[in-house]
Every structure is written in C-alpha cells, then in structure tokens.
Amino acid sequence: MPNQLPADSVGLVTPQTLHFSEPLELACGISLNEYDLVYETYGQLNAAKSNAVLICHALSGHHHAAGYHRLEDKRPGWWDAYIGPGKPIDTNKFFVVALNNLGGCHGSTGPRSINPATGNVWGADFPMLRVRDWVASQARLADALGIDTWAAIIGGSLGGMQVMRWSIQYPQRVRYAVVIASAMKLSAQNIAFNEAARKAIISDPNFHNGDYLAHNTLPKNGLAVARMIGHITYLSDYAMGEKFGRDLRSGSFELGIAEPVEFQIESYLRYQGDSFAVSFDANSYIRITKALDYFDLAREYSDDPVLAFQGAQAKFLVVSFSTDWRFAPQRSREIVDALVGANKAVTYAEIESKHGHDAFLLPDARYEQVFKRYLASVEV
C-alpha cells in the first residue's frame, strides 16, 4: 500500500456481523435456524434511505469490496477500482453494502461454521444452496439495515445472476439492476468445467467426503487444481499469450540439457492454485459452483425468459466483454433480448477488452465511463 490512503479510497473499513435468529428455509427444503452475515458499508445512508446500493459477489468474492482493513494491507478490496469517492459507484452519493454470502468462508455462516444443533463444524452437512437463497438472505440484511428499496443492485458473473434473481424475486425493492458478464443459465461447457473442478477436490485423499476438518487436514491439492481449472477459463487466450507466451521460468530447450522445462504460465497457475487453496474452503467451493450450475432464471417460467422478466420493475444496465468466453457477449445479449421482449428499460454495452472474463474486475477506461455515466443517472 502507498504511504497514505489514495484520495479516491473509501479508507479504512471494518467488517460488521449481523446475527439472524429467524429460520431461513432454503430451496433444498432445509432450514437454517440461525445464521450470521458479514458485510461492509461505504458512504453514508441518507435520511430517506434512498441511496443504498448492494454489491453481489462472484464465486470467490466476499464482503471486502473496497478500501483497506489495515494500513499495512498490500492491496485494497476486490472492486476498489470501481467503489469510492468519484468512482463509478460513488460513495459521495451512494451508501454501498457488500456482503459475504451464506455458504462462503469469509465470516458468514458456511461449512466451516458451527452447527448449533450438534456443536460441531457443519462440514459436509452444510446444505446445498441456490441463488434464490442468497437473495432471500440479502433481503433480510436489507430489512435489518432499514433499507426498503435498493437504489441499485450490482454484480458481475455469479453476482449478476443474483441481481437478475433480485429483480424478479423482490421486484418492488430494486430500482436499477446492473448485470455484468453474466448469463441467465450456465452452458453445458460451463457446467463441465465446474464438475472437473469439483472432481479434483473430492479426489484429493484429504477430502474425507467433506469432513476433512474432523480429520485435521485440508484437501489443498484438489482445491488448487480446481482453482487452476477455473482460472484458465477466466482469462482470454490473447491475454495469456501476451503476458506469458511460451516464456520459460526454468530449464532450456537446448539439446543435451536434462533439466525439465517449466513455462511461466505453469508457474503462474500453480501460484494461483496454491494461494487459493489456503484462503478458500473446499466445501464452500463445491456448494457455490453447484449453485452456479443450478441457476436457470426461466425454469419456473415455462423456460420463457421474457415471461421471467415480466414482473421486473427495475431499469437495467447489461455489460459484456469481447474476449469473455466463460460468459460470452451472446449470453448478455440473450438477457437484453429477454428484457426488450418484456418491454423493460435496458441499456447494453459490450466492452472491447483483452482480459477475458476477469475484465469485469479490472480497471478499463471505457468500462469505467459506461459504468459511471449510467450510475450518475440514478436519482437518490
């Protein structure tokens, strides 16, 4: 971190925890009798409580979206480029709420939490989740914060799925919906990538059918491979080629040299996998990717996406990125077509970017411009 906080930073922030004792019935039929949600806020809630913005995170995201926890932190929250004074999600204007979803591993109730019914860690017994469950818990968080209606709900990737679900599950509580690099349902290829990642986890001898904590071990190798698989899909071929090409980290192609060749991209992927394996939970990963797979916005509407959006009241911004092949621009155009068919107000932008799916997280002048101008139109 620099010697002083950047002028456009939200500054030092402290996570907060809310405990909920009213049971939450999940889509799977199981109820969580009590649970915690960890969240952060940036900016000030106005007297009318009309300026609140909810940030919905993606697979590996969490509540720390902006600012710093300590002056010693090496990097800010995961979306700091877009949240702060004068930034697209302007904290001089908006009161921003970011949370860690249920089933995660960054403080909200999840597989690593204690099951109050047994006194033991939930582990493999933690129930499977759906996107609608996250949205229901987020609505309860809004109630606890005194927020009847969100000025905007914003999310990328899996976060965008939550935004869409909000727009049809609680239509009267969302004024603007920003859906970034997302889809109304996963493709077969996406489901296949998720299953390959899960297979890597459950094949790790240290997984113990999900009860690894009871065995005082962690399936780090399996989780690392799962992250490597996922990370490949977040990058574009162009970006990988430009950054790494066929450059070597060690070894040589010269004849007569026995030392094994290691490419830079191999080293990079191993680093990403190993880092993730010590910061994330395998049971959380399995549940979150399953929620991704299960999501299908139109399923309960006779598979008609136009009908699914019929009751939505929000105005929409849909954003895609040209080299994103995990959630390709065509998937975003399908969202737009459904919204147009349902006669909803929608703005669409396809951003030229070389960074693939990860582009929604990274600084980009055009993306920032579109984002900023759209949110400037939101009246509070």
Swiss-Prot record:
Pathway given in the UniProt record:
Amino-acid biosynthesis; L-methionine biosynthesis via de novo pathway; O-succinyl-L-homoserine from L-homoserine: step 1/1
Cited SUPFAM superfamilies: alpha/beta-Hydrolases
| InterPro entries linked | AB_hydrolase_1 (IPR000073), AB_hydrolase_fold (IPR029058), HAT_MetX-like (IPR008220)
Molecular-function annotations in GO: homoserine O-acetyltransferase activity; homoserine O-succinyltransferase activity
User: Which keywords label this protein?
Assistant: Acyltransferase, Amino-acid biosynthesis, Cytoplasm, Methionine biosynthesis, Transferase
Any idea what job this protein has?
Answer: Transfers a succinyl group from succinyl-CoA to L-homoserine, forming succinyl-L-homoserine.
Task: Return the similarity comment.
Answer: Belongs to the AB hydrolase superfamily. MetX family.
NCBIfam families from the UniProt entry: homoserO_Ac_trn, PRK00175.1
Pfam family example for this protein?
Answer: Abhydrolase_1
Localization recorded for this chain is: Cytoplasm
Highest rank taxon of the organism? Bacteria
Q: Report which reactions are catalysed by this protein.
A: L-homoserine + succinyl-CoA = O-succinyl-L-homoserine + CoA
Question: Binding residues for substrate, per the UniProt record?
Answer: 227, 358
Any single GO BP term: homoserine metabolic process
Task: Tell me which residues are marked as the site Important for acyl-CoA specificity.
Answer: 326
Q: What is this protein called?
A: Homoserine O-succinyltransferase
Per the record, GO CC terms? cytoplasm
Q: What is its EC number?
A: 2.3.1.46
Q: Which residues form the AB hydrolase-1 domain?
A: 51-362
Query: Quaternary arrangement and interactors, per the entry?
Result: Homodimer.
Active site residues according to the UniProt entry: 157 (nucleophile), 324, 357
